[in-house]
Amino acid sequence: MKRRPPKKREVAPPIVAVEGSLAEPLPGWAPAVLVGGATLVMLAWTWGRWPDLLIDFSRDLYTAVQLAHGRVLYRDIAFFTGPLSPYLNAIWLRIFGTSLHALVGLNLIILGGFLWLLYRLLREIGSRLAATVSCLVFVTTFALAHLVPMGNYNFICPYSHDMVHGFVLGIGAIYALARYTESLSTRMAWAAGIQLGLVQLTRAEISLPVLLACACGLVAMILRDPRVRSLRSSLALRVVAPAAAIPLLVFLLMACFMPWATAFRGVLGSWVWVFDPVVGTMAIYRESMGLDDLSGNLGRILAWAAIYTGVLLPPLVFALRTRSNQRGRGAVLVLLAGLAAVIMAVGWRHTAPADLARPLPFVAAVIGAMTIFALAKDGGGEPARAALTVRLMLSVLAFSLLGKMLLNARFHHYGFILAVPATMLAVLGLVDFIPGWIAKRGGSAGAFRWASVAVLAGLVAIFLQLSATCLARKTTPVGEGGNTFIADSRGEQVNAVVGFLAREVPGDKSLAVVPEGTMINILSGRTNPAYCTNLMPPELATLGETNVLGDLERTPPDVLVVDLDRIGPQGLRFRKEVYATRIAAWILAHYELVARFESPPTHPMRIRLGIMRYQGGAPSAVDPASPS
């Protein structure tokens, strides 16, 4: 049977068919120059200051290094998300060397590829200008921003590589389905299915939104596009088969090296946490989602929605009342918006920047609802349906990702991934969707468009200043060779600890850091013999304190580096929570404090580290957390 030739790709961006005619002010070369230039500037500015010294990121680096040296994930070393990211990183490190710089190189490549992918996806539903502005916001506010003092929440040294890899694969799957709606290419269907299979090997909070988004897209294609409807069986096979087969094949492969139950839990990844009632009720996750202060967070969402409405409504009315040929009045609007942006950039410390993302769930829901309504009308032909289907998938992804912080949406922290799709939709709305609606009514779309760009520039200026404030704290060089980076002042104590270990502890002695901080293992070149290398509440809740303690008793590390502010006779401490009472008691009973390294009491990033040596059954002579 002769195959149908692929349909020629539409030259005009689909948004033109959906929202009305808009001018394209940027030449074809501008996006690459602007986005590429901004990325290079941000990289140069933040270079070497991406990771946090002790928290989160080093867990992924240490795990990948251990896998590269032959240990087996889940069997020899505990891990609580899917196997894709650890093994991808381990393969790369096995080839290019087990160092921080090698992993940074991989992440730079992923970031470059993702920028291309994000731009192409946004061009499926938006103009060149809107896609370019969106990518600029992404680079400066998410990918390379430094919005909290610790670092971690960026695409180069992320707190969790599973978040980045899963998100990239999710956007890739949506883009593949977008291309399928245009060309009915079987390769694009297979590409979507393969990426859906891989994304399930990352994290539940990423894989579930991606699956929901793609499922909604497939349903919309089948219901609204006669071409796809006639091919629905083959489409379902090509998408669903690899999405189901890849996790199954990985499970069977892992089962060759460990018990089946262990392999199954490994493939489930963080789904184990999703259904764990103890983890789900932890204060950190309730606070992240906004459930700790329900009425207060709802009030903040409404307040910020009202603020944004108050900011955007006057220029919207002004643009509607201004004809497109009244350039003078349009210029006045743009100048006023520019003035507002300058005021925002200068007075940002009085705007509670941590709350600026609060209305994002509302934005994603409204755009999604309007997209469903437009699809139900079934107007505009194939290009319009294709664009609306892509917009629907992006809207579902945006709203679903925000579920982890639904009442506490933010650009920082988890928001460096979870808030990206909703923010991209908001930018498209300001630069394309609303101006297109204005143009259809004869108003000055260009004036509102450039006014929106000015306001967005003001928001970006706020976050650049936040990044500058946080980056200014990082002035202490840490590490040697391929593991060098620049840390905050805690690096002075870490350098002292690493130096002490090199001088006083034989190189074959094992080391654990309590409760977290495997970067010290990396910097000192020492292995943690324990199965669980991160003694934080979620890990202990999943494995059970009894099991973790039993493993420590069987293979006690020769030396501990302990955060003295987070251990005492009552247990380990995390924020206001006290946990792991028996583990803390065992440490105090079997380890002796031999050295301590402390920041001055008045230091803003104060840390107190102690080195403890294993003494068998001999109890520690002092409470290590007591003042020296």
Q: Could you tell me what each predicted segment is?
A:
Residues 165-191, 221-229, 300, 304-319, ...:
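Membrane-interface transmembrane helices that cradle and orient dolichyl/undecaprenyl
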Residues 105-134, 139-144, 172-175, 317-318:
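Transmembrane-helix motifs of polytopic, lipid-linked glycan transferases
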Residues 187-204, 210-218, 244-245, 250-251, ...:
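Membrane-interface alpha helices of multi-pass inner-membrane proteins
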Residues 1-44, 235:
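Start-transfer (signal-anchor) and selected internal transmembrane alpha helices
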Residues 208, 354-370, 383, 388-392, ...:
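Hydrophobic/aromatic-rich transmembrane helices and adjacent perimembrane loops
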Residues 80, 470-479, 483-539, 548-569, ...:
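Short periplasmic/luminal acceptor-recognition loop of GT-C membrane glycosyltransferases, typified by
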Residues 176-198, 227-241, 330-339, 389-398:
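Short hydrophobic alpha-helices at membrane interfaces in multi-pass membrane enzymes
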Residues 48-63, 72-91, 98-102, 258-260, ...:
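Extracytoplasmic catalytic/substrate-binding loops of multi-pass membrane glycan-assembly enzymes
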